Design a protein with these regions (language model features):
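N-terminal presequence-like segments and the immediate start of the first folded domain
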Residues: 13-91, 95-105, 114-161
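Surface-exposed aromatic
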Residues: 108-110
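Sec-dependent signal peptide recognition
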Residues: 2-10
């Protein structure tokens, strides 16, 4: 459980770094190019020696984003619960996608982890305000113990043509 919280915490700081640097992605993310694709890590991920990348753009055009929770620019969980957290996540997702000149229409799959499945309707109302049909494929699960006590975590896969 501690490793999962550390991984998600790193993603929080990655999101804070990305959201402030949409116009100059190379200034905030470290990129490693390999034959299979480009791997992006935040400064925090590198400092903490986390065993994962924050975002990967494969040579085949797939873009994998590590899970996002509803944090602000300082990496702290936004107050107010599911609604504000969800909007913060979509702001982060937009910034992540912008790093590769992508948008919500380029997302093909989402994994939603929610702390209370009874809030599913509330989440869906916000989700559908960001995505338009045809919607990405999606999986969901109830999850207890998300980093920082978050109500939601969202992980996405996009395609860059």
């Amino acid at each position: 459980m501690r490793l999962i919280k550390s991984i998600t915490l790193s993603t929080l700081f990655f999101a804070a770094t990305v959201s402030g640097s949409e116009n100059n992605p190379s200034s905030s993310l470290h990129e490693v190019q390999t034959p299979v694709g480009n791997f992006y890590s935040s400064e925090l991920s590198l400092e903490q020696n986390f065993p994962f990348s924050d975002m990967v753009h494969t040579a085949g055009g797939l873009v994998f984003l590590s899970g996002l929770v509803g944090s602000d620019d300082s990496g702290q969980l936004v107050s107010g619960g599911l609604g504000p957290e969800t909007h913060a996540i979509f702001g982060q997702l937009k910034a992540h996608l912008a790093q590769l000149n992508l948008g919500f229409q380029d997302v093909v799959k989402c994994l939603v982890m929610i702390d209370d499945i009874e809030k599913w309707g509330d989440f869906n109302a916000i989700y559908t305000s960001y995505f338009e049909p045809p919607y990405p494929a999606r999986s969901a699960m109830g999850a207890d113990g998300l980093a920082l006590g978050a109500a939601l975590e969202l992980e996405c896969i996009a395609v860059k043509k």
